[in-house]
């Protein structure tokens, strides 16, 4: 399934249009969908989960960019043990996320990536910090 052309991506952009001030939702949709297609392929992410997870992540990415532009930060609790337990996933996201950083001229923190990881793999947090 192509995230770029999916109804989920369009719905996410529509949602963002109502809730963000500093970013263009259509630009977020385009860049985030391309990022996700490459990431999903690299992670060998299950096809059946791509649309729903893609929707959630496009919204997360839109709000993330908005936070970064507004100079607001979020903190991810237990970041060090979580990253230690999920290095491979983190490294793949970190390598692909450069496309978003370049498109919007921003730097994305490890904390933001951790929240993406939990959206992709919800069960990884409890296992890592237990």
Locations of regions flagged by a protein language model:
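A cross-family "folded-core" feature that marks the main globular domain of proteins
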Residues: 4-130
